[in-house]
Amino acid sequence: MAYSIANNHLLRKNFATIKNIIDIPNLIDIQKNSYRRFLQSDVPLDLRKNIGLEAVFRSVFPIKDFSETSSLEYVSYTLSKPKYDVEECHQRGMTYAAPMKVKVRLVIWDSGKESGVRGVKDIKEQEVYFGEIPLMTENGTFIINGTERVIVSQLHRSPGVFFDHDKGKTHSSGKVLYSARVIPYRGSWLDFEFDHKDILFVRIDRRRKMPATVLLKALGYSVEHLLNYYYKSEQIYIAAGELRKGIEPELLTMQKAVVDVADANGEVIVKANRKFTKASIKKLLDHGVTSIPTSSESIIGRYASADVVDPVTGEILLECNQELTADKLDELRQKEVTTFNLLYIDGLNVTSSFRDTLLADKISSSDEALIEIYRRLRPGDPPTLKSSLALFDNLFFNPERYDLSAVGRLKLNFKLGLKVWPDCTILNGPTMLTAAELQNAEQLIGSLLNGTRPVDLALKDRLSSDLTKSLKKLDLKQPVPERLLEQLADELNSAVANAEFFQRDLIAGLELPESFIKLMDLIEQGGYDENRRRIEGLRRNRMLLEVAYGDSVECCNRNDILEIVRYLIELKNGRGAIDDIDHLGNRRVRAVGELLENQYRIGLVRMERAIKERMSLQEVENLMPHDLINSKPVSAVVKEFFGSSQLSQFMDQTNPLSEVTHKRRLSALGPGGLTRERAGFEVRDVHPTHYGRVCPIETPEGPNIGLIASLSTYARINEHGFVETPYRLVREGQVTSEVKFFSALEEEGHAIAQANALVDQDGRFINEYVSARKSGEFVLVQRDEIELMDVAPKQLVSVAAALIPFLENDDANRALMGSNMQRQAVPLLRADSPLVGTGMERIVAKDSGVSVIARHNGVVDAVDAGRIVIKIDEEEYDETGTGVDIYNLVKFSRSNQNTCINQKPVVKVGDKVKRGDVIADGPSTDMGELALGQNIIVAFMPWGGYNFEDSILVSERLTKDDRYTSIHIEEFECVARDTKLGKEEITADIPNLGEEALKDLDESGIIRIGAEVKPGDILVGKITPKGETQLSPEEKLLRAIFGEKAGDVRDTSLTIPPGVEGTVIGAKVFSRKGNDKDARTELIEKIEEEKLRKDEQDEVRIIRDSARGKLKRLLVGKTAGAKIEDRHGVTVLAKGKKITDELLESLTMDRWATISVSDGTDVEEKVAEVLSKLNEQVELIRGVFDDKVQKLRRGDDLPPGVIKMVKVYVAIKRKLQVGDKMAGRHGNKGVVSRILPEEDMPYMDDGRPVEIVLNPLGVPSRMNVGQILETHLGWAAKGLGWKIQKMLEEHTSEENLKKFIRETYDNADFNKILDTMDREELLLVARRLSRGVPMASPVFEGAGEAKIKELLTRAGFATNGQVTLFDGRTGEPFKHKVTVGIMYVLKLHHLVDDKIHARSIGPYSLVTQQPLGGKAQFGGQRLGEMEVWAMEAYGCSYALQEFLTVKSDDVSGRTRMYEAIVKGKHTLEPGLPESFNVLIKELQSLCLDVELLEGDE
């Protein structure tokens, strides 16, 4: 235990007060889990869920031809092993991908014209190659064409229904207009909106609007049905001339009594003009009152909710939705109508908007409505009923065209309170209903038809028996769920009671069970039409078909649309709430898997069209599946997605933090998302639901602010794509350690306490009132009302922000800069983990994948700079094939940002390692912790103006000690192609070049490793054939002397570009298969092969040793059952003697198998078993390594036309210099202004100089006080380290040393470990602590002021952290004391070397003839209008003339100047700038006749 502490640097003094409840989930799980779900590659074929790739195949297949005589069905897919591993893909510029094979089945049907029954004629099954699919590496990235890329997760609007209003901005009256929008995952959008006259309109796909009732009528609803669906009605009785109305308790509470209302005894219960209350209504009902008197005034002007019919003649007296006038009332009295129904609309609680919409809608029947919709969507096409029906059906009810998705259905049901379950699809299949269910069929159907409405019993019986018979014929895959049958019951009842029936044309297209056809016949013939004026066909009763027959519930259905309209009307009436689009319950994350799934679907749909055409054109019977399938469209779509999608990004590999953050990024941009220009303020803003899900701090500055966010530390994404955050459950004021994840919707309405709320030992809240969050507000609630509690204070922020100590003391804007700048820190030569950290450093380093983590428990067997060999513990043997783990470390490899990736071992031979331990550090990691910068002694004081405006004064000591030196690796590539004129050749034999230029090239023309190179040096010599030209006499002479070679080739060697100076650290040669290898290639191959052989030998050796140990344990001490001979036949041990260790050592291992033992059971069998297993393992290892060697010797796959490709890697050492950008972790950034000699820096009274001087004025206005607290705490940490150093120098006793360390840490767990340490371990720990005691000050629970002061005192410093400094130049003390301390300072990727460049001549722009701009174009420095004024002000007329003519765009002047310099004349003859000619041409193009007249006049 102690050893692992000393070894693994677990020594941070932590200031956290809240104990760790739950570990932070793996930081890159968002990527890995998503892709794992998508591929399901490790799931057996028959257990794969219908998600990801599997779901795409199942949704597109089966593919039928147009005549439906054949169909292509999907069976399964399998992935093979990738051709190249990750490392090879990097080097060769390949994509890391696995070949995919899909098993498909081609079924050919017999048309069955004679028999009338369709039968299967032929079935062919085959595996078809389906292109390659990129695989994710262990670190959550993809390798596409040799570069590492990340697919960023997209944050988009969730499918579902959204209700909103225009905030009164649309109409001049300022009236609030409500609207609803149904957004599917894919398919047509449906919008409902009110206009200022309160008429409800609908738009399909944002086309022209029409009354919403047109859509409802097209769904097959009658006017009467709709009115009664959205409005309640009151029954009016006419008895003996008196008007009375029935008691409807719901409606009465909204009304006043017109006259006194009395019971049968005449006791007045409600007086006139008084409101009805719940109590008074209950009293009326208790007294047996069923109707109350009303006046004719109160009912005149209201509308009929159903047709009122003359009881004698059957004539309609009052139509549905017709207004009741005084004349009509009199007519009803005359015709002796006793009762009729009126709609209840009071204009306050129930508005007439829907009734007005019905009135405004001039369409009377369902058919007209369908045709009207067709006209709106396809203006110009002549509509027919059939085409209108087909179009409407495809809009919302066809699963191929319209997909709400499981999430959309979930959101819709959640919002509208519907009960359509995402899992209630019943598929046709071979299995029958179970016997028990068949017995219950009668009973089932009886219960099915027990409805609320009256039904003819005879009809019910007929229906029942018929349904039972046909249920027996139904071949349902699974039993019909109860809830489904209940739903079917309601539908059937309403169908029977309203005498609505299905029309045949709808059914014809569907293969319905017989029972439904029979049902419809019965309903149609049920004799219910005698009392109806007309039967309105219920064309769209899709719900019944859908739920009973098992279509996808991920389509829209009639009920949804009715309910959406109902909710919208309720909103209008002041009930319900609108949705907040920025709420994280309304936004969801599409991670890699889902993004790729969508692309794959696009590709498969394209492929489907092609297959259908092929099936129709060719004779299918003679074809196999592979003749029909061409997977090119699918591969092309996938390739395009990974190569050029907006969300597929070049991985930011500057340092481990930038990698992790890039993989955890959430972007609102991208296809199907927002655009920068359109996104307003609200979308970008922080929302209460972001708490614990999305970081409020980390987002880019600039146009993308708020659109790109980062996942919070503990957040994860659930299967629906919503971001979840963990909370501890609280029961009756008691905090439990049970943790549950909540999405933003689930957390709504809960009272959530902060993580730092005070609790006692038992987890009960100490304070009576606790500060909590509830529905996005901060509230004080009683402790018993708290339901949840945060798990940790850092739950709020992202990984980068959680790495900033004292974040709580920084202004948010600066914290944002701090978290963004940490991602730009360059990995330094010597990583140094921060003295003041937050405790997150280890987690980031481990999850980023840059350091090497032990895969098993074991013992380190061998270590060198390039590899670690670990012998695995025996109890872990079964998992791995062999007992050895070999870790080949990455050495000086180039990252995407040209920084250096280098791994260094941190273990030594004999160390015990546990699974999950860090055994090698990567870039920017120090003993398994993230280390982006250096701990520097800083002083806050002005110094000679060198820290004006955030400049930084740096001591030369830092460059001398290479504290800020970084290595950058550039890759240069040279390609030899086969040209029309002949082959290019890579060679050292280059014409017209001296010995000096070629001194570092080997005979193959490639530079040697270790060569120092500067701009213009040749890296790879290459010659290209020249076209045949007329030869000059000189060339003819050269040809005659030197033969052909010199004349017909030109030098096209790869040279170093300007601004690059470094050391060659590697070269790789790739040659086409079949070409002869040059000496360099053979050398490289030999080195690689030696490495492989060494690995092989180590594995075999360790396995042999392990087997030898096992055999010795079996044999030593046993009695020989027969004499033992060596291979020469000499007896080495007589029978009956004990076997010893020495004896076994004298024999070869294969002779051990021949030893027979007299005591101990089955020893010989065990020995044989161990030896046979050993031989198997050795064979296996040798096989694997032979394959690798074969692969190495094979030629390479190069692009067409390429013969050979050489890559050269140059390492550039960048020291810190003036102009480099540096920053702290608190957004305090600056540029190095001067590197001052060590002796001139301000120094302390003990002679120690400070290393960096910062401007104190950079703190107050920026409000990032965190940097000051960090400086103080760092100073205390360093001071304590110096004290320990002093104790070590003075050889203090072990006890005193332990005591000091124990008091410093003040941690019970650490004290236990300290007590178990022996002297050696203690000294190791003390030596490490002497550099400074590392502290962890986690965000929002960091060290307080009192704690820092206490530590400063303990370290022997003043509590204000200030020191007297002396001027290094004069030795005088500065007047005031200065704040000095340790700050963690980073060097950022904006290096001056990458920006500075010089040009004298270079490329010019084609049109203006002015020099190009920028370093990449080797351009010049622009001299603008204001610079010209400055030159004029100085009076530098000649210099200015030169700038504006010969140095810019005076073409003839340039050549004259060149000639003048060559001839030694120093005169300037400027000509006419080219831009003048351009101006003239521009004016001429505007038809202005402008010309320049030259001459004397």
Curated annotation (Swiss-Prot):
It comes from Trichlorobacter lovleyi (strain ATCC BAA-1151 / DSM 17278 / SZ) (Geobacter lovleyi). Belongs to the RNA polymerase beta chain family. InterPro entries: DNA-dir_RNA_pol_bsu_ext_1_sf, DNA-dir_RNA_pol_bsu_external_1, DNA-dir_RNA_pol_su2, DNA-dir_RNAP_su2_dom, DNA-dir_RNAP_su2_hyb_sf, RNA_pol_bsu_bac, RNA_pol_bsu_CS, RNA_pol_bsu_protrusion. It is an enzyme of class 2 (transferase). NCBIfam families: PRK00405.1, rpoB. The RNAP catalytic core consists of 2 alpha, 1 beta, 1 beta' and 1 omega subunit. When a sigma factor is associated with the core the holoenzyme is formed, which can initiate transcription. GO terms for cellular component: DNA-directed RNA polymerase complex. The lineage of its organism: Bacteria, Pseudomonadati, Thermodesulfobacteriota, Desulfuromonadia, Geobacterales. This is DNA-directed RNA polymerase subunit beta.
